[in-house]
């Protein structure tokens, strides 16, 4: 191959690489993430993730109000402040979802739902909203925790029913709080909850990096 042929070959290769990079740029639109915490436990996860400084939209949906929330975390009051633990097994039912909540999902964002199964608000909302998002072909992920063993058999039965409803979604993932408690059994209970919040984030991060074609995510989602 003479010098002229070599230059033509290099020019063609450079053009091909440019076109491939251009196609990758066009096809890999930046992912707009909307983190949504459902119920008290889910809202705690949102506060934990917010501290990481990730460029995203944040919303907490729970009761009671959280006046300490930073201004860029939206809050929607939903549910009752009183939970009757004796009737958890009877609480698998559809809740009335307000227009304010439904309007959150009108955008083309990637929605990430966090909750702790066991509470009436978070458990039922997660189940209902996941079904709604799936039906509307929205991109979403649901991450929820299963309760500690000491929280009682009725609460455990309630959450198992909800988990069965979520098992049909491939993008729903659960974390067992009892496993985390055993791992950090020498720590105080609040430490186990903090570790659970981080486990929820890491589970989201691992799955979104596998799913998304946005190459910038690996830099924008801290470890």
Residue ranges with predicted function:
Residues 10-13, 19-223:
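Tubulin/FtsZ superfamily GTPase core signature
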Residues 1-14:
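N-terminal secretory signal peptides and thylakoid transit peptides that target proteins
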């Amino acid at each position: 191959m003479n010098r002229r042929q070599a230059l033509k070959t290099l020019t063609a290769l450079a053009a091909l690489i440019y076109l491939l990079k251009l196609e990758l740029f066009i096809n890999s639109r930046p992912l707009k993430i909307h983190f949504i915490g459902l119920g008290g436990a889910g809202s705690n996860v949102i506060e934990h993730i917010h501290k990481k400084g990730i460029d995203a939209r944040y919303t907490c949906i729970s009761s009671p109000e959280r006046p300490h929330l930073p201004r860029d975390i939206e809050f929607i009051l939903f549910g009752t402040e009183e939970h009757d633990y004796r009737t958890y097994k009877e609480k698998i039912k559809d809740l009335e979802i307000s227009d304010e909540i439904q309007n959150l999902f009108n955008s083309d964002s990637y929605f990430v739902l966090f909750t702790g199964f066991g509470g009436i608000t978070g458990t039922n909302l997660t189940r209902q909203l996941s079904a709604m998002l799936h039906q509307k072909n929205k991109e979403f992920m649901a991450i929820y925790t299963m309760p500690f063993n000491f929280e009682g058999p009725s609460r455990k039965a309630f959450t198992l029913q909800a988990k069965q409803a979520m098992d049909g979604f491939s993008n729903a993932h659960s974390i067992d709080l009892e496993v985390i408690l055993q791992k950090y059994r020498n720590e105080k209970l609040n430490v186990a909850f903090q570790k659970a919040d981080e486990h929820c984030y890491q589970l989201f991060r691992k799955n979104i990096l596998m799913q998304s074609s946005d190459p910038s995510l690996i830099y924008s989602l801290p470890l």
